[in-house]
Amino acid sequence: THASEMTIKNELAEFNFSKDHAVYLPYSTNDQQPLAMAFQNIYDATTLSQAASKLAFLPVTIDYANGIKLTLLEADLENYPGMFVESQGNEHRLQGKFAPYPAKTDFYPWRQQEYVTKAEDFIARTSGPRSYPWRILAITEKDTEMPVNNLVYALASPNRIGDYSWIKTGKVAWDWWNDWNLKGVPFKAGINMDTYKYYIDFAARNDIEYIILDEGWYNPKSGDMLTVIPELDLTELISYGKNKGVDIVLWTVFNVLDSQLEAACEKYAQMGIKGFKVDFLDRDDQKAVEMVYRIAEATARHHLILDLHGIYKPT
């Protein structure tokens, strides 16, 4: 902890190993700008000495043989950039790497997604008494222990939203997955009322609790999620779904929701929307992490669930 205001230039985080162990690394998928990507990739099975010198996101697993594995994780990431690692080759070392603090940003025209165009020469600005993220080496003797390890959850900050009995977990019917492509139906499939009523009917028949209205229910180029396209009547869809026991989740972009946060939460919660699928963060610098917390606080206050997509690992 530290009481005064600080600018944090960098953090030295090293993980040194005595041998050339096998390692499983998920590399960044963006070779040009490795800090900007969706945090989704297959794992590359290699050794510490043969691993590529490029950024990998967490979790990363080191194989100690005889069934023992160490998984590098992070917990309680708040108001701070997330950690990547990069292999140091023959040194049998993984070096922590952190996104610098954004200096300037711009927006992609198609969906108004914010991206960093210039970075500062430091990683964080912070003030007041605080703690910093946990860095975890979770030891397992069997692979079946890995997915049930609860250290990230156990080391995270306690629940801040109080009563969370309003949160309803469940499955979702997802329009984007098959590009709204319905065959053998007596209407033109697409982002329209007939298509979404069909999805609601499908969800009801198969005990699926939600449907998502993915990209296109508002004009993504506008960056305005308060204005629904004229082909859709959300009030009617919500009522139709309610009568069949199916709730609706709306897709949006992180910074678009953040820019209209209170208005969007109030409007759609009052209408009966149950949550947001929030997409295309593709960053974990300090400002991006702060945005996630703002969104989580506001949506929880309005009893809206969150489905976070295109985001860094859970902490």
Region annotations inferred by a language model:
Residues 123-202, 206:
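An acidic-aromatic substrate-binding cleft motif
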Residues 214-315:
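Aromatic- and carboxylate-enriched substrate-binding clefts and catalytic-loop regions
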